[in-house]
Regions:
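Active-site glycine- and acidic-residue-rich loops that bind
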Residues: 1-12, 67
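A cross-family glycoside hydrolase active-site/sugar-binding cleft signature
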Residues: 1-3, 24, 62-64
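Short, ordered loop/turn segments at secondary-structure junctions
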Residues: 5-6, 25-27, 89
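Generic hydrophobic/aromatic pocket-lining and core-packing "Φ" positions
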Residues: 7-10, 18, 50, 73
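A structural preference for short, pocket-lining loop segments at secondary-structure junctions
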Residues: 10-26
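Conserved active-site-proximal phosphate/metal-binding subdomains
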Residues: 31-62, 67-205
Length: 205
C-alpha cells in the first residue's frame, strides 16, 4: 500500500505495483506522503483528491485526512473510496501514547490551529502551530533534511513534553483535532461504525 497526495503520485504507485493507494488529503495530520514534485505543491483537499484518484487508477483507494467520525467515513465512501484511514481520530484515545499536553492541545484546537512545516523533522508535516515553529520559520535558516533534523530536535521536544512546555513541543495533528474523542479504542471503533451506518442510511433516505 502506498500513499499519494496527487493523482500523479497515485499513477506512479500503480505503475510500481502496489495493491492499494491511500489518497492523503491536505487535512491529514502527521508527515505528508508526497514524493513527486517540490514540497508544498501537493496540498489537495480530500474531497477534491479522492474522486480524481479513483478515476485515475484501477486500484482500491483508501481515503485519509480530516476524517474524524461516521459522517467523514460516509462522505469518503460516497466519493468512491473503498476504505478509510484515520489517525487524529485516535489521538486522545486511552491507548494513544501522545503526552497529556499533546492530547489536551489537539482536543482544544481550532480548525486553523495547525500548519504544515518541515522545521521540526526536515520533512513536511501537519502539526499544531507553536512559538517554536513560528520562530524557526521566521529565522530563514536552512533546515537539514529528514532524518538528521528530526534527530537534532527530538531531544528538545521530548524534554519539553516532560516539563509540560507545549510552546517547544512538536504535536502532530490533523485539521479536525477538536472532533477527537477520548475513551478506549474499541469503543471509538464501535462508535465510528454506528455513525457511518447511520450517515449512509440518511444519505439513502
Amino acid at each position: 500500500i502506498g500513499t499519494a497526495t496527487t493523482t500523479e503520485e497515485a499513477a506512479a504507485l500503480e505503475a510500481a505495483g502496489v495493491d492499494a493507494v491511500v489518497a492523503q488529503g491536505s487535512e491529514a495530520g502527521g508527515h505528508r506522503g508526497a514524493f513527486l514534485g517540490p514540497p508544498g505543491r501537493s496540498l489537495v483537499g480530500l474531497v477534491a483528491l479522492v474522486p480524481q484518484v479513483v478515476d485515475r487508477v484501477d486500484l482500491p483507494v483508501i481515503a485519509a485526512g480530516g476524517i474524524m467520525d461516521g459522517r467523514g467515513i460516509a462522505a469518503a465512501l460516497a466519493l468512491g473510496a473503498e476504505g478509510v484511514q484515520l489517525g487524529t481520530a485516535f489521538l486522545v484515545s486511552d491507548e494513544s501514547t501522545a503526552s497529556d499536553t499533546h492530547k489536551r492541545r489537539a482536543a482544544a484546537s481550532a480548525d486553523d490551529a495547525t500548519t504544515i512545516t518541515d522545521t521540526c523533522t526536515g520533512r513536511d508535516a501537519r502539526a499544531i502551530r507553536t512559538p517554536l515553529i513560528d520562530e524557526l520559520e521566521r529565522s530563514g535558516l536552512d533546515v537539514p533534511p529528514f532524518p538528521p533534523q528530526s534527530m537534532l530536535t527530538r531531544p528538545l521536544h521530548e524534554a519539553a513534553a516532560e516539563r509540560d512546555r507545549d510552546e517547544l513541543m512538536f504535536m502532530l495533528s490533523g485539521q479536525a483535532g477538536a472532533l477527537a474523542r477520548p475513551g478506549p479504542t474499541k469503543e471509538i471503533m464501535e462508535r465510528l461504525a454506528r455513525e457511518a451506518e447511520a450517515a449512509i442510511e440518511r444519505l439513502a433516505a
